[in-house]
Amino acid sequence: MIRRPRPRRLLTALATAAAVGPASPATVTAAAAPRPIYAPGTSVSQLQSTQVMVADRTSGTKGTWARYSWNGSRWVRVNANAAAVFGRGGVVPSAQRRQGTSTTPAGTFSLVHAFGVGNPGTRMPYRRVTRCSWWIQHPGQRDYNRWRESCSVPASVARSSERLQSYVDSGLYRQAVVIRYNYTTPNRSGAHSGAEIFLHYARSYTGGCVGIDSMSELTATVRWLDPARKPVIVVKA
């Protein structure tokens, strides 16, 4: 008996079927997008940050202080009892804040780094203050609103800047965190200007920073911060 050769098209189809296996209906189910759950009193959800601090002015230069941590299903308040302290000029929207007004900018801000007398155990980038550590506030300087490590700062620059060791000695900057206000591309004058907005210890008022009136709570806050969790501070007027 003479066998007839099979058509090449049929052979190709059979080979493909053998490789793929039996057909079955395809079912594709898209994963549901996580639902944003906002930290109390803020518009920050766990999709943006899992560490949120809230400083809410209630009257004068004082207000409430809270730290919230996302535990995977809900926000948990983790701070010790403490009050927030604000600039003696009050709290203003960050877009309206101007240098030299002693006002605290309101808004939601990320953080740059921590600093002080020694790392208390934080995962944040940390700088130790020395006798030659300055924070430059002179608008004419290239490193305006930046740390400068120099033992020979010109008098004209020093007059409008802060020698950080002086504030360490007074207890205010033993531990502190740089708040990312007017930092990335700083405005040197006009609206949304000003330098050196920190989180630090304070009792009654600040020059525009956010203060905590408990050194133990401040130290615990610095230790708690983890850049992998994208911490933010929410300042409310």
Predicted segments with their positions:
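Secretory targeting and sorting signals
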Residues: 1-32
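Alpha-helical hydrophobic/aromatic positions enriched in membrane-embedded helices and signal peptides
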Residues: 99, 205-206
